[in-house]
Amino acid sequence: MLVNRRYTAKGKNLPSSPKKVRPIADNIRGESYIKAIAVLCSMPNKGAKLLEKVVKSAASNAMYHNKNLSEDMIFVKTVMVDDGRRRKKIWPRARGRADRLVNRNCHIFVEVDEKKDIKG
């Protein structure tokens, strides 16, 4: 019998646009934990560093709740990047006009999975 145990981590209102983080998330979805961290460490993007922190948090949650679990048994099951809170600012322009500047944030949800056989 095969039992799935899933462990999650969330990063809320992280200071990067979801449009910039989603292509990075596509690279690690379905990969092993060790390979995902290696891919994220080699990327120079700000979103990769944010995603790396959330993936490490999910893996540490898994290892905390299951003491006989090691890093090579963990896989990245789900990565979701959603819109977060938007901060709107007024940007002064020429001739007394003003534009709106929108700073976008994102929510990152990571779910890691481990599979093990149970005899019985």
UniProtKB/Swiss-Prot annotation:
GO terms for molecular function: rRNA binding; structural constituent of ribosome. Keywords: Ribonucleoprotein, Ribosomal protein, RNA-binding, rRNA-binding. It comes from the Bacteria. Disulfide bonds: none annotated. SUPFAM superfamilies: Ribosomal protein L22. It holds the Pfam family Ribosomal_L22. One of its GO terms (biological process) is translation. GO terms for cellular component: cytosolic large ribosomal subunit. InterPro entries: Ribosomal_uL22 (IPR001063), Ribosomal_uL22_bac/chlpt-type (IPR005727), Ribosomal_uL22_bac/org-type (IPR047867), Ribosomal_uL22_CS (IPR018260), Ribosomal_uL22_sf (IPR036394). Gene3D superfamilies: Ribosomal protein L22/L17. Residues 1-22 are annotated as: Disordered. The keyword S-adenosyl-L-methionine does not apply. This protein binds specifically to 23S rRNA; its binding is stimulated by other ribosomal proteins, e.g. L4, L17, and L20. It is important during the early stages of 50S assembly. It makes multiple contacts with different domains of the 23S rRNA in the assembled 50S subunit and ribosome. Part of the 50S ribosomal subunit. Belongs to the universal ribosomal protein uL22 family. NCBIfam families: rplV_bact (TIGR01044). This is Large ribosomal subunit protein uL22.
